[in-house]
């Protein structure tokens, strides 16, 4: 057999697939079982959620990053198949990670919980898979639960998604039932990768990782051609050239190999020092014999939510910059730029995909880089049209121009799809109305579950929406959203003033109708959170020059009359007047420290949904 024939023969036995599911429907457990079944890992190494390698993922029990692993499986037809399993996150903020892993596969296993049925995210991920023309294999998991209703769920898959579920494997990943059937279905139904191992190299970078010793490690999927150590490669987006040092696959550990060819999913190192040189979604090609065009990459994802991150210890500003650079390498959807605030000093304005993403980045910086952070209230991106015809983009409330110069402000709207049990439809609709939502559609999926669609401003979803939705439905609702564009709204900027000074980090943009109530809530919250000073501190919420709410932190005062035994009123009055003078002087020079909780209070306005 020639080299080419060997490669083609091997290629016909490659199967690339990923697992998609709603949060908690059991995809990481299923991945564990598949690893066990194909003996990729020994019993000793087995731990729950093996592919979730970040501590944070294991603690929260969610998958954040995608992971890939190569497995060998001896099928019933006697052939040994090479499978690449790419584990994906299920949470709405990480849809991007999902779309990246799907671009590297030919098939997807769709895991549906036998008790809960189809959830909002299941649908979102299925549509992503269909966009990538993947072969989808439905699987009904958790059939060992007492509340499992596999037949109902089978019907649901057919009705709601329109997939043929007659051959859907009934499994229990926890008990290890039905795992072999899944592997056989993958062999039978998922197509082998197409491509020519002799063609010019085209490899898709679907993730990258920074290693202090080896520089950047790119995770790649070979679409055409072959790559070996010593070969000169070129990045198509940046035009930079490198020499390959090592290629290999993950079994979950990194294992160097002689070459990677069509259909392989593995990694490549090439002494790439600069993070910006390996863009996720870029195509790697050979420098000597380059491909004509790049692979259709991923869409560059735009952040939905922005917030300021400031180090509590200002000396750590450079450490924070390095931390963000390293995180950005693994997380192509994180964006940041330097900014300064009068209240908080130097920091960064960062863009995130959503609230969970924001929390996780914060937590990773605090854990992995040991930097304590202050975060400002998250805000979305507004399009501001000026009276002179100019359009500016505002992601930070303190940059909003003077109201006299603004013609209109447009804010992003999302289409939110919620799947809720029947009994909670009323409270969910009330929640959405309170969040300025427009009702679009409602469909009964079966006797117990309803899909509700609303159009809601993104700014309203950013604050606590998911938590409130969960608490209104006892945790049963699932939720997914997509951006549908910008619409004009009557929005105003609210400033918070302490002792007559604006605190820029506490400013936020709010709908005019809700401004008074939001202002009142924040002022009252700050009154509880800011410690009492030796002088009186007024807290005011203002729109432009107009004060809409005020609260006062009373001064702490010593009892100056304690020493005064005599009852002489003039003596007492003199002491009190003297104290008053002193307080007045302190007030002029005194500055007020704002604790971190106060910044968070602006975010957590849970009771702030005005009842209309």
From Swiss-Prot:
Gene3D superfamilies: 3.30.70.240, Elongation factor 4, C-terminal domain (3.30.70.2570), Elongation Factor G (Translational Gtpase), domain 3 (3.30.70.870), P-loop containing nucleotide triphosphate hydrolases (3.40.50.300), Translation factors (2.40.30.10). It comes from the Bacteria. GTP binds at residues 24-29, 141-144. InterPro entries: EF-4, EFG_III/V, EFG_V-like, EFTu-like_2, G_TR_CS, LepA_C_sf, LepA_CTD, LepA_IV. Keywords: Cell membrane, GTP-binding, Hydrolase, Membrane, Nucleotide-binding, Protein biosynthesis. It is an enzyme of class 3 (hydrolase). It is found in: Cell membrane. The keyword Ion transport does not apply. Residues 12-194 form the tr-type G domain. It is a peripheral membrane protein. Its EC number is 3.6.5.n1. One of its GO terms (molecular function) is ribosome binding. GO terms for biological process: positive regulation of translation. The keyword Protein biosynthesis applies. It holds the Pfam family GTP_EFTU. One of its GO terms (cellular component) is plasma membrane. It catalyses: GTP + H2O = GDP + phosphate + H(+). SUPFAM superfamilies: EF-G C-terminal domain-like (SSF54980), P-loop containing nucleoside triphosphate hydrolases (SSF52540), Translation proteins (SSF50447). Belongs to the TRAFAC class translation factor GTPase superfamily. Classic translation factor GTPase family. LepA subfamily. HAMAP family: LepA. Required for accurate and efficient protein synthesis under certain stress conditions. May act as a fidelity factor of the translation reaction, by catalyzing a one-codon backward translocation of tRNAs on improperly translocated ribosomes. Back-translocation proceeds from a post-translocation (POST) complex to a pre-translocation (PRE) complex, thus giving elongation factor G a second chance to translocate the tRNAs correctly. Binds to ribosomes in a GTP-dependent manner. This is Elongation factor 4. The gene is lepA.
